Amino acid sequence: MKRKKTETRPWDVAEHLKTEEDIAAYLEAVLEDGDSALISAALGDIARARGMTEIAREAGLGRESLYKALSPEGNPEFATVLKVLRALGLTLHVKAAHR
């Protein structure tokens, strides 16, 4: 008897970021980790979920530049991160770390 092959496709978090709450929870979890490459990639995931072209336009950046900056290999300037956060309708908050 031949086994049926199960077809799979890569999991894309951007497909699951449907609500503001989903997006906020995802970004908060990534920020807690503190890995700058992961934070950039997460912003890229969120931008893709919202529409990269629209986010690039609202941030005043080129679409290709934004893709590159927010890729796992990207290293965006902090100013770029702030522009993207604003374009996404998000803000950055700081709280004291417990030591």
Question: Which residues make up each language-model segment?
Answer:
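Short alpha-helical DNA-recognition segment
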Residues: 48-68
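Long, contiguous binding/interaction regions
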Residues: 32, 60, 97-99
